[in-house]
């Protein structure tokens, strides 16, 4: 693990020096992830930002949150493709929901430049991405979907967040108990029974396997 961290840290430093941007590296989940990241680094070093974006995008589409952050950085800067605030916000929000704290600054900056209609469109894209991951049985999307309803929507949806935090707790996903309980405090007592029933129904519908730390993703997953 220490060797892998050192390896990735060196790659992050290299990219940052070349780009002058806050590109982030990952603790790759597999040898193939390491190879993909190395290829992206080589592309950046060669000033082939278009190829770097293509490589990062492949990983970003697989919910690798560091790659999503790198997509946001490059697209915000207009490196490799023309500047695109909509796509940069999309990847930035997904990275933020995946636990990349630095992505919050990118999202905040971009929000100041877009119209509310544009932001609404991106919010919908993010929600669709997370919903698709849930439909595909991605247990890591559960807490992110709950967080989405509190931190990305214009008005927090405490009810939906509570439902998914409740499911997360039932599946032994770490650090979800406090989030569920805190969210419960924002819900009227008359709504609790209905929401708990809905949580049980969704829990049975999706039939996720319980969270297994040994099978969980590395730094790329939340």
Predicted regions and their residues:
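Short coil/turn and helix-start
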Residues: 45-46, 61-62, 75, 79-83, ...
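N-terminal leader/linker segments that initiate helical-solenoid repeat arrays
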Residues: 24-55
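Terminal, low-structured helical/coil segments at or just beyond the last alpha-helical repeat
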Residues: 33, 117-138, 175-222
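Bacterial N-terminal signal peptides
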Residues: 12-22
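Hydrophobic face of amphipathic alpha-helices that form TPR/SEL1-like repeat modules
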Residues: 36-43, 55, 70-77, 106-113, ...
């Amino acid at each position: 693990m220490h060797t892998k961290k050192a390896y990735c840290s060196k790659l992050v430093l290299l990219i940052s020096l070349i780009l002058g941007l806050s590109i982030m590296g990952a603790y790759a989940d597999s040898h193939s992830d390491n190879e993909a990241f190395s290829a992206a680094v080589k592309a950046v070093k060669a000033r082939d930002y278009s190829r770097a974006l293509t490589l990062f995008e492949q990983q970003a589409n697989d919910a690798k949150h560091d790659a999503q952050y790198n997509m946001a950085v490059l697209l915000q800067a207009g490196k490799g493709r023309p500047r695109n605030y909509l796509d940069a916000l999309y990847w930035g929000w997904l990275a933020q929901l995946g636990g990349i704290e630095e992505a919050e600054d990118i999202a905040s900056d971009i929000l100041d430049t877009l119209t509310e209609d544009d932001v609404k469109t991106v919010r919908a894209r993010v929600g669709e991405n997370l919903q698709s991951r849930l439909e595909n049985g991605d247990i890591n999307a559960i807490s992110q979907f709950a967080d989405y309803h509190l931190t990305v929507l214009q008005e927090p949806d405490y009810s939906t967040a509570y439902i998914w935090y409740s499911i997360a707790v039932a599946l032994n996903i770490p650090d979800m108990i406090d989030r569920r309980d805190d969210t419960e405090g924002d819900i009227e007592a008359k709504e609790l029974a209905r929401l708990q029933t809905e949580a049980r129904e969704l829990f049975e519908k999706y039939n996720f396997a319980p969270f297994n730390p040994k099978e969980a993703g590395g730094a790329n997953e939340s």
